[in-house]
Each structure stands twice: as structure tokens, then as C-alpha cells.
Amino acid sequence: MAYQLYRNTTLGNSLQESLDELIQTQQITPQLALQVLLQFDKAINTALASRVRNRVNFRGSLNTYRFCDNVWTFVLNDVEFREVTDLVKVDKVKIVACDGKSESTQNKSDK
């Protein structure tokens, strides 16, 4: 099962809006829209894992953290993101981190 975190991105929201419009005009079924979203979840996770190679450093003050259901959530204040020549400052950032390994990979490594 792929994580659904990226459905709430600009790309994911645009896809959902387009699918909703197609459902309303009866051009596709809700079941097909769900299949498209599931495929999007798999594809975006695979693409980000294999194609993104840029490195960004960030520093901030940890406000809160939580670990629940194998998911880490961090809230940082006064954060600076640095990439080679760029610097971006933001007041607040929420980071959600999930285990990138599939269950089958974890089970093999646990043995």
C-alpha cells in the first residue's frame, strides 16, 4: 500500500478536482476515479524515491513531535531552508515522515 500523503499537494488536488468533474459529468465512474488515485499514490511515491536527487538543509526550533502508527510528525518554528545558493525562511513547518520501506522489505530484513 502506498501512502496517500501527496494527494494534498497542488498536483494531487488538481487531479482530485479533475476526477470529481469527470464523475459529475458522468464521463467516469467513482470506482475508476479511485483506481486513478491509487495509481497516483504508487507513481508519486516511486517517482520521488527514484528521481529526486537534490539536497536541501534546514534548521529550525522544534515545537512538537509525535510518533504514532509508524509515522513521525514534527512541527518546527522559525525554519531556514538552504539549497546551494538559495535561502528561504518560514515561520512554521509541519513535517510528516513515514517509513519508505514496503512491508515485504521490512519482513525480509527482520528475519
Curated annotation (Swiss-Prot):
Please provide one cellular component term from the Gene Ontology annotations of this protein: transcription factor TFIIA complex
Q: Using the UniProt record, give the first listed, main subcellular location.
A: nucleus
Q: Where in the cell is it found?
A: Nucleus
Which InterPro entries does its entry note? TFIIA_a-hlx, TFIIA_b-brl, TFIIA_gsu, TFIIA_gsu_C, TFIIA_gsu_N
- What is the top-level taxon of the source organism? Eukaryota
Annotated keywords:
Nucleus, Transcription, Transcription regulation
Q: Which one GO biological process term can you cite for this protein?
A: transcription initiation at RNA polymerase II promoter
* Listed Gene3D superfamilies: Transcription factor IIA (TFIIA), beta-barrel domain (2.30.18.10), Transcription factor IIA gamma subunit, alpha-helical domain (1.10.287.190)
What does the function comment of this entry state? TFIIA is a component of the transcription machinery of RNA polymerase II and plays an important role in transcriptional activation. TFIIA in a complex with TBP mediates transcriptional activity.
Could you give the subunit structure recorded for this chain? TFIIA is a heterodimer of the large unprocessed subunit 1 and a small subunit gamma. It was originally believed to be a heterotrimer of an alpha, a beta and a gamma subunit. Interacts with NCOA6 general coactivator. TFIIA forms a complex with TBP.
Instruction: Please report which protein family the annotation says this sequence is part of.
Output: Belongs to the TFIIA subunit 2 family.
Q: What is the recorded name of this protein? A: Transcription initiation factor IIA subunit 2
